Amino acid sequence: MVSDVWHNLTVPHTASRGPGRPPAAKAAETRERIIGAAREVFSELGYDAATFQAIAIRADLTRPAINHYFANKQVLWREVVQQTNAVIVNAGRSRAQDETKLLARLSAYFTAAMQADSEDRSAAAFLVTSVLEAQRHPELSDEEHDSLKHAREFVAWAVNDAIARGELTTDTEVDSLVEMLVAVMWGMGFYAGFVGSHQELKAVVRQFELLMSNNLWRLQS
């Protein structure tokens, strides 16, 4: 008995881990909850009005919990930008590169960027918000994860490749065409994130495809 007591006093106690997910998995899950909540709050309120308290409430966490994972609002903003670009913009580029025609490439990229296939388009809303906030707050701009810059680069690549393959004429004004398509994309992105329903967006994308293929209307001779 005495030896048992002495053993218990001298041997460090190893805490038994209860049932449930391991701490690392829970930490990753909490981090994702924060990022998802921040994406929604930033989109709804803008960068200036968004607070850690509002994000904590949306994530069903405490404000100190947000601070535990992200030192300040700018750090959290950059993380949301990075993740949103990785999921949406990169996916759009990947899908588009599987296509061979300009219209199919643009449609694939636009559909992915606007989350037209999803009922939840919070990421599309945030992409638009991130472009606006980068104009208001240049310090928030991150060239590596600049969705406007990436969109412009993709459209320029698609247009130039279409010219090289003979799909567009060689006298095409590339710069103005690229800017027009980028403007259309972000206008549709705003509609996707803040205005239209899922079904309405799908119809808009379809009308865009008809317009670009010159099949939206036919003039009577």
Ranges and model annotations:
Residues 1-29, 219-221:
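N-terminal intrinsically disordered/low-complexity leader segments
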Residues 79, 90-123, 174-181, 205, ...:
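Hydrophobic alpha-helical connector segments
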Residues 82-88:
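Short, basic, alpha-helical segments at the C-terminal edge of helix-turn-helix-like DNA-binding modules
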Residues 104-105, 118-142:
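Amphipathic alpha-helical segments used for helix-helix packing
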